[in-house]
Amino acid sequence: DGAAMGQGSLSDFRLLTSVVTQLEGGVFFNVGSAVILPEVFLKALSLARNLGYVVNAFTTVDLDFVRHYRPQVNVVSRPTQQGGRGFHITGHHEIIFPLLCAAVLEALAETEDTPTERRQNA
């Protein structure tokens, strides 16, 4: 049923756009999508900005085992031209993604320490 598929696609795009409107100061990961998600993400970001949301200072990450043109341009480069940073990480998802998650969790745990605890541990 084409109408139902179209409605589902519109619903998904609205949901993605609502998340992108809150991306300021956050991180967007593109994991393994070489064509569709980079295009849809860039359109959702453009819509959010055109609606007046401030979405400039954030980080984007393209994680894939091969570099592709669209993610490099539509995830790493163009979205962060007004601020923020973009990264491309090349490697196998099953290795890189768990390592990246562990690094983020470790960094978050370090920032949760109070200044007193940090001095005592130094």
Where are these regions (language model features)?
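C-terminal functional extensions of proteins
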Residues: 6-9, 15-25, 34-122
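Thr-Gly-centered strand-to-loop micro-motif
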Residues: 30-32
